[in-house]
Amino acid sequence: MIGLIGRKVGMTRVFTEEGVSIPVTVVEVEANRVAQVKTLETDGYAAIQVTAGTKKANRVNKAEAGHFAKAGVEAGRGLWEFRLENGEEFAVGSELTVELFNEVKKVDVTGTSKGKGFQGTVKRWNFRTQDMTHGNSLSHRAPGSIGQCQTPGRVFKGKKMAGHMGAERVTTQNLEIVRVDAERNLLLIKGAVPGATGGNVIVKPAVKA
């Protein structure tokens, strides 16, 4: 399914004709350039590889420079891939713009969530805190028991404990497109999307729409 690579600009709001305020996230979608077309014959699956944005020449390594030069496209800030469905065809060097979403009502947005560092169970997993008084003087935010005794004699995998929080791939589904601004290459999406301001996001037509 073809999507677009964008950059999260921030949040604002727009008003309907009735005066209702709608919170929106502004996603800047510069033209996505096709850097490679993968086919069943050569790669075993059909897909396109795209790049977006720009990258300083001194930040492009030789492998990347050769890859972009072969495609005849300007080096971008990364490479992303979209699987092709039956009948879809694209040429190397062609561009995908925000107009791809002119007829789309709902989208799925994927980004990297904000990193929170090492966090305890209360913040990371919404555990309840223990008593602030009534004889408890040390274990207010402690997780409590993490398992049994000699049987099984270990902590089960997946146990919710303190650890690194955030900085992981997150997808928010079924977000509504409020406006497509082709002139300024902007998508206005209702609500919040994952990640920090300036982060890369992948916008695709919603799979559950």
From Swiss-Prot:
Description of post-translational modifications: Methylated by PrmB.
Entry keyword set: Methylation, Ribonucleoprotein, Ribosomal protein, RNA-binding, rRNA-binding
Gene3D superfamilies linked: 3.30.160.810, Translation factors
Intrachain S-S bonds: none
Highest taxon above the source species: Bacteria
Annotated Gene Ontology cellular component terms: cytosolic large ribosomal subunit
Gene Ontology terms, MF aspect: rRNA binding; structural constituent of ribosome
InterPro entries: Ribosomal_uL3 (IPR000597), Ribosomal_uL3_bac/org-type (IPR019927), Ribosomal_uL3_CS (IPR019926), Transl_B-barrel_sf (IPR009000)
Pfam family, one: Ribosomal_L3
N5-methylglutamine modifications at: 150
Example of a GO biological process term: translation
Complex and partners: Part of the 50S ribosomal subunit. Forms a cluster with proteins L14 and L19.
Family of the protein in this entry: Belongs to the universal ribosomal protein uL3 family.
Record's function text: One of the primary rRNA binding proteins, it binds directly near the 3'-end of the 23S rRNA, where it nucleates assembly of the 50S subunit.
Protein name: Large ribosomal subunit protein uL3
Lineage, broadest ranks: Bacteria, Pseudomonadati, Pseudomonadota, Gammaproteobacteria, Vibrionales
